[in-house]
Amino acid sequence: VIKVNRRGNPEDTGAEAKPSAFAWARHASAGFGGNSLPEGARRRALADWIVHPDNPLTRRVIVNRLWHHHFGKGIVTTPSDFGLGGDLPSHPELLDWLAEELLRNGWRLKPIHRLIVTSAAYRQSSQRVDAKAASLDSGNRLLWRQNQRRLDAESVRDAVLATSGKLDITAGGPGFKDFDYTEAYAPVYRYVSPDKPELWRRSIYRFIVRTTPHRFMSVLDCPDPANLTPARIKTTTALQALALSNNEFMLRQATHLATRVDNESGSRAEAIRRAFALAFQRSPTDAEHRAAETLVAEQGLFSLCRALLNANEFSYLD
């Protein structure tokens, strides 16, 4: 039997603690049957309470995180705090409507993703110029334009591998370890970067060492895995430019990309167009093509591919 400690003092116990939900949430019974029920039944009661059709909070939190993922900022900018200490929603009616859509679609996330990415708000350009809107809403809280967003660390890694043609898109199965493990007085993890297919899987399958963050990923603002991170911090530093330009992984993938475009092209001009198509999903402008021709003639395809993988256009979504 667990009892409530008065003022946190274990020597001064009060009433018996019983499984229950928050009393302020009145969409369903706050009691879960007391301690007489088996643990499995109490867990089921909690799960049913969380996803009860009359409980909008769970759905609001979920759709807000989906919105945050696509726009870089949620309708509520404090994704882990919907209480009195959190931010107010910028579009409360939209938040509630999306929450109801989630329920209507049987809690499936894919329809909500589709709904968001096909919306007029999402399909706006971040380059839109509107002096009046900028003066009234410089932070773009009301979404009069799209937010320019930089790819997160995992997406940068996956995009580089996809562009070079080395990304392993196999779904499921065991993850990969990009570190060596040594048993000592305390475990020692040393990150390695051999150029082999086992390490070319998507980043979602990468084993995370909570006590030893990956340096390259950390430089690109991958959060410390030992801490809870409701929203990632975005920074722009010289270290990021140096890492993207000189990291061993980036140099190897630039080499693979150069080999790929060379094999898939019959001429230098065609190789340049193919490199731009793979990296930027477009053809080069006349000025870009002339500059690329000069660079390739002097330093080879590797230098062009290295430059493309380091360009803002590769790492940012407009």
Task: Describe each model-derived feature in a short phrase.
Residues 300-314:
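Charge-dense polyanion-binding interfaces
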Residues 207:
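Conserved beta-structured recognition patch
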Residues 202, 212-221:
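Active-site Gly/Thr loop motif
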Residues 1-198, 223-232, 245, 250-302, ...:
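Primarily short, surface-exposed interaction patches in extracytoplasmic proteins
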Residues 218-221, 285, 310:
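Exposed, low-complexity/repetitive linear segments and helix-based recognition motifs
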Residues 235:
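Glycine-rich phosphate-binding loop at the start of an alpha helix
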